[in-house]
Amino acid sequence: MRLSEFYSPTVKNVSSDVVSASHKYSIRAGIVSQTASGIYTLLPLGLMVLRKVENIIREEINAVGFSEILMPTMQPADLWKESQRYDSYGQELIRIHDRGGREMVLGPTHEEVVTDLVRSSLKSYRDLPVNLYQIQWKFRDELRPRNGILRSREFLMMDAYSFDTDFEKAMKTYDAVFRAYRKAFKRMNLQTIALKADMGAIGGSVSHEFHVLTPTGESTVYYDERALELSEMNDYGIEELKEVYAATDDMHDEKSCGIAPEDLKTARGIEVGHIFYLDDRYSRTMNVKFCNTDGHSGTHVKMGCYGIGISRLIGALIEVFHDDAGIKWPLSVAPFKVGIVNLFSKNEECKRVSERIHSVLPNDSLYDDRDDTPGVKLSRMDLIGLPWQVIVGNSFIKDGVLELKNRATGDIELLSVDDVVSRISV
């Protein structure tokens, strides 16, 4: 992609009320543009990152046996009244009326809709398990939206729902999703810590949150050192988690945690995922039953629900991967693999070499062919944060070599054109 043909409005300065790094760089690098308080337009670079995050999550959730659906954003208020959440959910729930006066809500979550969907076809234990997920926009009327896409009023979420015959099977599903989350976050180079969490407005009896630890996180988390060691393992489940202490602020109890004060760690974290075992919280209030192996038809299905904030993850990634110059995207989620910076756009030989490099990865490289000063071009590419930069500049004019810069480390290698082509083609 040529930068001259690509909509990428970078911004030099942001408002003084923009505090977090993710908010600042998401605006400055042209990832998002603010439409209103807590409402953002995803720009081309941001949408490319979003799609990569989305696909990683989709692949891992598919791998544990979930089927993708797409439920409506607008939901009948009657379903929320049936589940007894319409009044208790609070002012975050956006309530509207259609032209016929029927009460509707804009979905902040979809437990009611998916439960209604499954009960329409569920008859026997033979119809279970049912594992469904969607990737859909959610709406919450946040009182104080802040930190850009980390806490906005409209956000993209993967929400999954499981329906099982009994507790044991439901917890196997819960554990499978727990492991899928771990794999998805690792693929994004994010180290997450799993914490015992409050059930909140969703309800249920077991809950875990996944947090990325960063000094600028919104939440306080408590854990012992073994929880961090566990988070570095390639694979672990909820059974292993029982052996360590890790809790959100809402669930932490210093007296009963069993950890000596000198061994208890505290940190700030950004919540990026949440899973719940719901038991029969919704199947009982919405009367979702099935006929079991004994022929008894009064058994309530056991449910779980699982959420990952996809657009929120973009903010979390920027919080973790940035420096004073801008963003440093991990390769797995970067909008492009390589940025090509031609510092002398009017030099025919520099132009020819830049075109050759671009032809190697036409869909995975961003070629800065604009007629700007070298300083502007280099600063812009650092701000955007692509994993690799190929710089066609003085080194090429003098010695015929290119600069290959690793954005994450800042290391620069001087390589021949052929060697650069070989390196970026891998």
Swiss-Prot record:
InterPro entries: aa-tRNA-synt_IIb (IPR002314), aa-tRNA-synth_II (IPR006195), aa-tRNA-synth_II/BPL/LPL (IPR045864), Anticodon-bd (IPR004154), Anticodon-bd_dom_sf (IPR036621), Pro-tRNA-ligase_IIa (IPR002316), Pro-tRNA-synth_IIa_bac-type (IPR004500), Pro-tRNA_synthetase (IPR050062)
GO MF annotations in UniProt: ATP binding; proline-tRNA ligase activity
One Pfam assignment: HGTP_anticodon
EC category: ligase
GO cellular component, one term: cytosol
Protein localization: Cytoplasm
Domain of life of the native organism: Bacteria
Keyword ATP-binding belongs to the record: yes
GO annotation, biological process: prolyl-tRNA aminoacylation
Catalysed conversion reaction: tRNA(Pro) + L-proline + ATP = L-prolyl-tRNA(Pro) + AMP + diphosphate
Gene3D superfamilies per record: Anticodon-binding domain, Bira Bifunctional Protein, Domain 2
Enzyme Commission number, as recorded: 6.1.1.15
UniProt similarity note: Belongs to the class-II aminoacyl-tRNA synthetase family. ProS type 2 subfamily.
Role summary: Catalyzes the attachment of proline to tRNA(Pro) in a two-step reaction: proline is first activated by ATP to form Pro-AMP and then transferred to the acceptor end of tRNA(Pro).
Protein name: Proline--tRNA ligase
Organism: Anaplasma phagocytophilum (strain HZ)
Gene symbol of the encoding locus: proS
